[in-house]
Amino acid sequence: MARKKIALVGAGQIGGTLALLAGQKELGDIVLLDIPDAEGVAKGKALDIAEASPVEGFDAGYTGTSNYADLAGADVVIVTAGVPRKPGMSRDDLVGINARIIKAVGEGIRTHAPDAFVIVITNPLDAMVGLMQQVTGFDPAKVVGMAGVLDSARFRWFLAEEFKVSVEDVTAFVLGGHGDTMVPSVRYSTVAGIPLPDLVKMGWTTQEKLDQIVQRTRDGGAEIVGLLKTGSAFYAPAASAIAMAESYLKDKKRVMPCAARLTGQYGVDGLYIGVPVVIGAGGVEKIVEIELNAEEQAMFDKSVAAVKSLVEVTAKVAG
């Protein structure tokens, strides 16, 4: 059976990490693409990782390029191309320049990889994934945004740290836009099946501490930006996107929070927003509509409003 093909658009920190993880998991052959001025970076990283494969013990072909024709036949395309956040910069500040980049990338994908499952990482995420779907014209089930898996992973890590338990036993969901208005769901998050509110009653933690963890989750990206000072997170975002790609390529049908296009679910129509979905061979095969209480719904609505305004700004900038 022929190997699958994974195309990575953007050979920066996330792109390089994606290339390594995809190879280590033997998901397929990898194409690392960047702009002509950075073609050497794409080729250099591809060669460097290929040379690591005999040591690590995995088989994968690696190609570095600046030519979109090399995306031909890609099963998955993961898009990281764009300008990273700098300290003091909000995700929204990135709209203008990244919208132009996404338009160019989307046209390349539409022409050369029309059957691909597209995962967008570029910020501001919810607006960029919507723009990608518009530019490609792909079925919305085949265009998805990586945000919720990352935000939930951060939430899970903070909770595991607080409870001093394995991250594997912590399940957590983050809904809404990938930004300051995201909604980490305390009610639907558990440790070994025990909901967080019950753990508060059991004396494992306090509501105040949980509130602090929720806020730290919202600020998770900015915390990393502030520490690195030279860019934004790349290990956890790459791991999150690879988990999504693997679920698609292997038809695992994992339930993951992702930015998906809603068609009436949660009272939202025609907008990409973070919700739990099932990812399988058909792409986004199902949107899981969980019941929200009044407080959660209010926070979710606020997040949706923030995404809507961002989409409007993007539409003006992108023309």
UniProtKB/Swiss-Prot annotation:
This entry's Gene Ontology molecular function terms read: L-malate dehydrogenase (NAD+) activity
What keywords would UniProt list here? Answer: NAD, Oxidoreductase, Tricarboxylic acid cycle
Catalytic residues, chain numbering: H178 (proton acceptor)
Q: Where does NAD(+) bind?
A: G10, A11, G12, Q13, I14, G15, D34, N98, I121, T122, N123
Q: What Enzyme Commission number does this protein have?
A: 1.1.1.37
* Role description: Catalyzes the reversible oxidation of malate to oxaloacetate.
Q: What is this protein called?
A: Malate dehydrogenase
Q: Which gene encodes it?
A: mdh
